[in-house]
Amino acid sequence: MVDSTIRLVATIFLISLTQQIEVCNKAQQQGPYTLVDYQEKPLNISRIQIKVVKTSVATKGLNFHIGYRAVWRGYCYNGGSLDKNTGCYNDLIPKSPTESELRTWSKSQKCCTGPDAVDAWGSDARICWAEWKMELCHTAKELKKYSNNNHFAYHTCNLSWRCGLKSTHIEVRLQASGGLVSMVAVMPNGTLIPIEGTRPTYWTEDSFAYLYDPAGTEKKTESTFLWCFKEHIRPTTELSGAVYDTHYLGGTYDKNPQFNYYCRDNGYYFELPANRLVCLPTSCYKREGAIVNTMHPNTWKVSEKLHSASQFDVNNVVHSLVYETEGLRLALSQLDHRFATLSRLFNRLTQSLAKIDDRLLGTLLGQDVSSKFISPTKFMLSPCLSTPEGDSNCHNHSIYRDGRWVHNSDPTQCFSLSKSQPVDLYSFKELWLPQLLDVNVKGVVADEEGWSFVAQSKQALIDTMTYTKNGGKGTSLEDVLGYPSGWINGKLQGLLLNGAISWVVVIGVVLVGVCLMRRVF
């Protein structure tokens, strides 16, 4: 009897304990459900170091000398209005300095011209056709445009010279030609002048002469590494309104994949296609393989009227943005890949553990449900009462043991869970983070000091040629122009006044004479 009573009490206690712990309604199952893996967006991009052969050029000091010289010649003949030969032959003759003259000018910082001639007539007019000796030196000189023709039946010659000199520093550029790297000077109009690395380079343009001295120029070639972003370019095709990746279309594999490389070297950003020689203004980069010349950018011939910043500056800024964008895409792609990896790993672990702990999925979903797997990946969910969770493994008379809440009668088995040691299951590399960097800008060639001097000299000539002086030494016009301001006006007014008084006197004398004659006769 006692044994029966004990069994009954134990049974009631177990039933009561089971009702406290088993709080899920298995009769209200819903499903089936399947855990979904996160699908990452395919992006084949990586950050790598590329070994290249770098050719660079550095310049220092005064390495560029600009000189100009020209003469205004006006040769006239005055045969009267009926002579068809009357008139002037005017022209501006460029007389750019020779290489030896420009060297001498650069040392003395003076330019030399022939003699001026103003209103040289008769036999003196032969100076217009003489061999001029460049013996008159000036710091700078601007011409005066004379066109005198004031001597009847004689020829008249007018000569006026202009000259100038500028010694400055310019940057030479690099250009790829036939797989080789050469130095060039870029004119404001985009013309490329080959520069010798061992001897001075001299060339002329109209009345201007240029001399580049390579003494302060250093050109070197070295092997170096560039940090680049490598992106696989997969061709796509459109079929029936849908876009497909032809990399794997029809089960075929792209045996010759194409890649884009976006690289950075100090403050320069550029695209480095595979197997190509790419030239920036002061550096060229070459990879192994077949060489295809690429000027980057391919437009040095830029008019100074179209751009306040050169096209290279704009391209450099654009490629710096591309470089940083590629870095950001790489970082986001890495994060996306990590999320996908974590998603798959988490789902596998969750499926495995949820088959042991039927409350695991409910905890992850934030719902009070229990799970029951009916296949390796599909499961049913049943609603449950909420289970408290705190900073201890015990709650009231229950203890969490082996993945279940069970009855606990030994308080010594309880302990605090407020502190725990972290365990890193993943080995991720450090993310590359984009940052703001200085971008090197060069400006247009026309804004460089030497070329601005050329532009100013040409503008000064235009201003001078706008005005013509028809007068000279020994002419009546020179006498008139030599009077002070207001003198002619005063003389004219005095002439008019004196003329009026004279007429009054004459008329008075005539009247007096008439009266006297009447009395006599």
Curated annotation (Swiss-Prot):
Pfam families listed in its UniProt record: Baculo_gp64
Source species taxonomy: Viruses, Riboviria, Orthornavirae, Negarnaviricota, Polyploviricotina
Native organism: Dhori virus (strain Indian/1313/61)
S-S bridge residues: none
Keyword Membrane: yes
Oligomeric and partner information: Homooligomer; disulfide-linked (possibly homodimer).
Membrane-spanning ranges: 501-517
Coiled coil: none
Protein's GO biological process: symbiont-mediated perturbation of host process
Top-level lineage group: Viruses
Classification via InterPro entries: Baculovirus_Gp64 (IPR004955)
Signal peptide: 1-20
Name the UniProt record assigns to this protein: Envelope glycoprotein
Keyword Glycoprotein applies: yes
Keywords: Disulfide bond, Glycoprotein, Membrane, Signal, Transmembrane, Transmembrane helix, Virion
Positions annotated with a glycan in the UniProt record: 44, 158, 189, 396
Function per UniProt: Attaches the virus to host cellular receptor and later induces fusion of virion with host membrane.
Cellular localisation: Virion membrane
Recorded GO CC terms: membrane; viral envelope; virion membrane
